[in-house]
Amino acid sequence: MKDYLVKALAFDGEVRAYSVRTTNMVSEAQRRHDTWRTASAALGRSLTAGAMMGAMLKGEQKLTIKVEGNGPIGPIVIDAHANGDVRGYVTNPHVDFESTEQGKLRVYQAVGTEGNVTVIKDIGMREPFIGQSPIVSGELGEDFTYYFAVSEQTPSSVGVGVLVNGDDSILAAGGFILQIMPGAQEETISFIEERLKKIPPVSTMIEKGLSPEGILNEILGEENVKVLETMDVQFNCTCSRERIESVLISLGKAELEQIRGEEEETEVHCHFCNERYKFSKDDIKQLIETL
């Protein structure tokens, strides 16, 4: 099944809802970064949240999420675009812990329970929107829920989950965001709160084959959900050799001459997708000649 995202309204507009399957996206991130199980879950949950938060934007808008906890994986950084392109990395991918007795990955131990979630939105204004909230659990779903409440004053429920196989490959990943709109009735809020207590983990629902629409129907009741739009989501990095060449050219002639004199081969590493671009002395010489 391919990855995709659903935007919906529920209860006659009282609830805005997003749901997404990100199994392939998280698998691609795991492959590129060689993340171990707990790091995969942390990165995958963050990518999933990023995909849904990106879908709240329009046109060419984009956002960056930084989860900076005091755990051993270090900062997690996600870039998400309104068109469904998402990329991201975790600073230390080789982090894993023993699962709990219930088989749950200890994501909070990897992320840490102190620190901040920062969201930077480039929405075409002169200055970006920057929102920040403290990490409350390190499990990420609760941390993004708290972010929406504190920074965007939007009562929300964020569920994100990743199931990882014994060989570190990704079995299932996805999530949902429910947002209560102004004027929502108490009955609606109570209904959702009760449903959220009863549903299985979102990653389990995806493993069992539920679609993003199926997840929203499971939580909100099929008769209450009105799907507005579906869109593809994918791990897609904007880096390329041409872009790296432009960055090198921007260093100027003197610095490029110095690099060429000191290095047999220059390597530039993209943190987001782990791609490495190599430039020989002749490559650098050709770049200098364009200046």
UniProtKB/Swiss-Prot annotation:
Record keywords: Chaperone, Cytoplasm, Disulfide bond, Redox-active center, Zinc
Matching InterPro entries: Heat_shock_Hsp33, Heat_shock_Hsp33_C, Heat_shock_Hsp33_N
Protein purpose: Redox regulated molecular chaperone. Protects both thermally unfolding and oxidatively damaged proteins from irreversible aggregation. Plays an important role in the bacterial defense system toward oxidative stress.
Protein name: 33 kDa chaperonin
NCBIfam families per UniProt: PRK00114.1
GO cellular component: cytoplasm
GO biological process, one term: protein refolding
Family: Belongs to the HSP33 family.
Disulfide bonds: 237-239, 270-273
Upper lineage: Bacteria, Bacillati, Bacillota, Bacilli, Bacillales
Location, primary (coarse class): cytoplasm
Any one GO MF annotation of this record: protein folding chaperone
Protein encoded by which gene: hslO
Origin: domain of life: Bacteria
One Pfam family from the record: HSP33
